[in-house]
Amino acid sequence: MSNPRLRVFAGPNGSGKSTLFDAFSKKYNTGIFLNADLIENELRINGFIDLSEFGLNLKQSDFDEFITTERAESLINKAVDENHKINISLKENILVDEGIGTHSYEGALISLFLRHHLQEKNIDFCFETVMSHPSKIDEIKEAKLKGYKTYLYFICTDDPEVNISRVENRVEKGGHNVAQDKISTRYYNTLKNLFNMVEVVDKCYFFDNSGEEIKLIAKLSENKLSLEVEPSELPNWFVENVLKYYI
């Protein structure tokens, strides 16, 4: 029996993670896909999330146990610090938002809950993350201990101002907003975490989206880095946060 697969589509806000995933999913079987923003949007529109859509069958006790975990408590505390309440219940395998008004922390918490239980059942899945917090690295380490083959698809631009502009364009088209200061702060935090994540996963694919189109610039497998473009074409973010460790 082959190992379950976990694919992580990571990069700063506005880098093009969703666009990259959409292109990838047209060519490959990605398993179950988790995107906290899409979960938040579905919760806002419908008021609930049907867990059967993710191949899960869970009870309220499963959710109660989950929210006592360190990562869940940390997320809930962040929500409280920003004056957001999380009031979610699990009834007949459906997560119901019992609160007034949906916010991003609910989408993030539910995504974390789903990842937790998909791992427990060794189900193939992939998820999007900004990867601005080192907890994501620990999460991948745990998946590997459970036998998962892990893949990182990392996409970035060479300037957070590009990301800010693209998020603004996304909002104009009806997409979700992220505060400019958060985009900038997360951009640098994400890059700080990049090499630590690279050391954990089995394979990495690096994409640059600084220009008009997404470009695959490098691959990493078995600690061997192979460039897909000329060295002179490599963006600064890759040179400073990945390449320098392999030359």
Model-based region annotation:
Residues 20-21:
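Post-Walker A alpha-helix
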